[in-house]
């Protein structure tokens, strides 16, 4: 979870048991338990997964209660751990992406998360199949109409407070609120109700990376027992619910999940991170009618005053036959102003330099400049989802990132301006689930942004498809 989130929480003395010892099952026992879990998943008709901070530690996000957890170090009077990358650039783990594949295959029916890192949504779990019990650090919601807004920056507040932005739904415009709970905040019905419903219906609840200490969330998995459901707990520490579980696995979550996917002959899909930004060109005619005064702004799609955390700087240049001064925009807001002859047309070139945490250094773009922008407001119809899917496929095929595409064009009459929204691939991760069970802590898998493996056996594909069809039946 976020260090910023922990610092924003109200102070309480009792945060539960911390500094908990970690246990590792012997390799042969671990393998047996992995195979047992795979069989339970294969037989399951309604699988629910319940996740905690332990599934995100491999993403560079510290947990709370482990030997080096945030609250453990706080209680010991030690410095807090430093995140290995900016919170907003954290990428889904192998476990996150394996859950996506299980959901796509129709095996996983619902995910319940205690985390506020938003990685389940970013990985591709559908919102309607996800309960974020404690909120999402990157989500704002409208208390009036219920609209949700997933941001590419961390929302400033926690505790369901008003933020600085308003709902963009027509005829609404209410002030938005953050979604992250403070200690005394009750679990929202929108999140807890479907979580309870699916736990009661589940024949298998798989708990991943959670110490199962925070109430009332920790009691949700137990609701499957009345209907004959089973519980499996995968965690390095012992939990208060271990005695209720059918299987308890002490091992690295990524390692266990990788082994399960291998046993099921299922591939863990790559993760492609796509970020959006807009280039806005605003024009006005000079008083003597001879020149065009224009302003160029590179802005967030979440609002002109919102930060662009994934962009470090922008280099702007012009066609070779024009002597306009180039510019380097290295402070937000990214803004430049120029004056040109009224009838001139030329190309503007952009080199977008990305911030730390992105897998690509920069992207090159160009935008034609014409002195006349239509006075009629309109939005060009572009199949956004088709563009995004094409970018994902290209990134995986080319084993690289930096691909870009236009997902929206719109013209506004007052002030006269044209906005072009770009989608660009800023990160790529591929996951290889090959295991080595010589020792519990040794998992031979690669997490990379510059390469991917598309190889998959025909036998594996047939088994995976058969498993999905059997589950849906």
UniProtKB/Swiss-Prot annotation:
Protein residues bound to NAD(+): 52-71, 114-117, 209-211, 235-237, 253
Catalyzed chemical reaction(s): N(6)-acetyl-L-lysyl-[protein] + NAD(+) + H2O = 2''-O-acetyl-ADP-D-ribose + nicotinamide + L-lysyl-[protein]
Major subcellular site: nucleus
Entries under InterPro entries matching the protein: DHS-like_NAD/FAD-binding_dom, NAD-dep_sirtuin_deacylases, Sirtuin, Ssirtuin_cat_dom
Entry note: cofactor: Binds 1 zinc ion per subunit.
Domain of life: Eukaryota
EC assignment: 2.3.1.286
Assembly information from the UniProt record: Binds to the promoter region of genes influenced by ethylene. Interacts with ENAP1; this interaction is enhanced in the presence of ethylene.
Protein name: NAD-dependent protein deacetylase SRT1
Source organism of the structure: Arabidopsis thaliana
Taxonomy of the source species: Eukaryota, Viridiplantae, Streptophyta, Embryophyta, Tracheophyta
């Amino acid at each position: 979870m976020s260090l910023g989130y922990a610092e924003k929480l109200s102070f309480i003395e009792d945060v539960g048991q911390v500094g908990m010892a970690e246990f590792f099952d012997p390799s042969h026992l671990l393998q047996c338990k992995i195979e047992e879990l795979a069989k339970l998943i294969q037989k399951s008709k309604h699988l629910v997964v319940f996740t905690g901070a332990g599934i995100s530690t491999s993403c560079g996000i510290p947990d709370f209660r482990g030997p080096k957890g945030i609250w453990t170090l706080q209680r010991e009077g030690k410095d807090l751990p430093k995140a290995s990358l900016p919170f907003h650039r954290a990428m889904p783990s192998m476990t996150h992406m394996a859950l996506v594949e299980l959901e796509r295959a129709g095996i996983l029916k619902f995910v319940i998360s205690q985390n506020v890192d938003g990685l389940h949504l970013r990985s591709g779990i559908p919102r309607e199949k996800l309960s974020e019990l404690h909120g999402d650090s990157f989500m704002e919601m409208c208390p009036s109409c219920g609209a949700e807004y997933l941001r590419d920056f961390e929302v400033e507040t926690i505790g369901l407070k008003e933020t600085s932005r308003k709902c963009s739904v027509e005829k609404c415009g209410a002030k938005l609120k953050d979604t992250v709970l403070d200690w005394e905040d009750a679990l929202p019905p929108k999140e807890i109700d479907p979580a309870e419903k699916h736990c009661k219906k589940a024949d298998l609840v798989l708990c991943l990376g959670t110490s199962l200490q925070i109430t009332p969330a920790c009691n949700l998995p137990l609701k499957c027992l009345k209907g004959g459901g089973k519980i499996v707990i995968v965690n390095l520490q012992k939990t208060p619910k271990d005695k209720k579980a059918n299987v308890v696995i002490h091992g690295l979550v990524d390692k266990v999940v990788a082994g399960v996917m291998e046993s099921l002959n299922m591939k863990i899909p790559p993760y492609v991170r796509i970020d959006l930004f807009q280039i806005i060109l605003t024009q006005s005619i000079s008083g003597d009618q001879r020149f065009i005064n224009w302003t160029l702004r590179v802005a967030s799609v979440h609002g002109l005053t919102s930060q662009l955390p994934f962009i470090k700087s922008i280099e702007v240049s012009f066609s070779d036959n024009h002597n306009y001064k180039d510019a380097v925009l290295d402070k937000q807001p990214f803004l430049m102003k120029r004056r040109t002859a009224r009838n001139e047309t030329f190309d503007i070139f952009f080199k977008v330099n990305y911030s730390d945490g992105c897998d690509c250094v920069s992207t090159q773009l160009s935008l034609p400049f014409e002195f006349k922008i239509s006075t009629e407001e309109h939005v060009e119809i572009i199949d956004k989802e088709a563009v995004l899917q094409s970018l994902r496929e290209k990134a995986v095929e080319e084993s690289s990132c930096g691909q870009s595409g236009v997902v929206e064009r719109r013209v506004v009459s007052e002030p006269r301006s044209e906005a072009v929204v770009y989608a660009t691939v800023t990160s790529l991760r591929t996951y290889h689930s090959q295991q080595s069970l010589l020792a519990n802590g040794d998992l031979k898998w690669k997490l990379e942004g510059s390469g991917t493996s598309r190889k998959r056996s025909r036998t594996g594909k047939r088994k995976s498809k058969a498993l999905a069809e059997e589950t849906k039946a």
